[in-house]
């Protein structure tokens, strides 16, 4: 199967994402301590309840305030092994920060929990010399994880800490899933995601890149050779509209386009003065903001309903509008228009309007990977292509196979994928008869 367990080659400095700066820069030590000391350390902290992984937020903030940054990072990463990327990509405005009691007073801003979490974890990754966690003695159990996105990495990390030999199979040359290939660069560059992958590797996880399950290794072989298998392959290719003129240069899936922006050396937007993004979710908003931040003069989002119907977060859309993105409501694409040379010139709408563009990005969803899941004996998928599994344990119809993340939910948050992976790790440990240590990070956070 030609696996490559080595870390990927360094990323090129000529990647277009390098032009996009942090929207929320890393705190300095003084800024972090000052912000931490505003926290009221609520006894029944609503921020903890609002965190899908149940990080003990008041405790990690208190440790920052007292200068114990390594201890702060340990609190965070116990409950959420991907707490670094979650600090940068979570919609904290509707999770922990949105639940902060300061919001009720309207006099002071809420605690910037995400930025404090980033400060603690990034500082620990950069400056920490002592390991954050100890690993249990090897117990002879072997687990395979399919995909290297947040759900699989979380599951793999927690299991490795309890002495299991965990191998992650990733079809791409670069691991990390959408954290590496799909996160808006103004939230996190690919280097940040890969630093977190290195942290997971350091827990004892083997990551084999360039190995596609179903092509290079048979699913039935994984089930036979490993004591348990975790399916966290994420989602597939961008969905298409299926309208005239769609095939050809200038029209691309938003997820695939962002991957080029983040990873492809020398990728540029030469000649693009008018761009449209079709869709109303968070992927569409991120893509539109990226285009605006890269200097495209006219960026428009086309959405088939109204702003009130959009699935994207309102606070993200507000930022997009402030950055110059125009939202066009009730815009139903009918066809793409091209000149005699095949170059994209615009998009015709069902109501007769035409929007000029040299670039159109489709952010209308992604394919499910049901065909891959069906290759695992005993694993079923529903009519939409999602894997069928117990929501509490992640166990599928095959008692040796567990699942989670976007392949199970259809696409949610990084932090919910991490929680899926953590739940499944607990279930796998129990199914394999592994006694989890009392002080194991696997016990931290929400059940």
Predicted feature residues:
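Ferredoxin-type iron-sulfur electron-transfer modules and their immediate structural context
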Residues: 1-137, 142, 190, 229-247, ...
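C-terminal catalytic lobe of FAD-dependent flavoproteins
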Residues: 16-18, 35-38, 342-345, 353-381, ...
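Residue-level detector of alpha-helix initiation sites
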Residues: 81, 149-151, 281-283, 408
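Feature captures the FAD/FMN-dependent oxidoreductase FAD-binding
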Residues: 137, 142-146, 194-243, 335-346, ...
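Phosphate-coordination loops involved in phosphoryl transfer and adenosine-cofactor binding
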Residues: 139-142, 210, 271-275, 330, ...
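N-terminal Rossmann-like FAD-binding beta1-loop-alpha1 element of flavoenzymes
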Residues: 143-167, 284-292
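Rossmann-like dinucleotide-binding cores of NAD(P)H-dependent redox enzymes
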Residues: 165-168, 172-203, 207, 288-335, ...
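FAD-site-proximal beta/loop scaffold in flavoenzymes
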Residues: 247-272, 338-339, 359-411
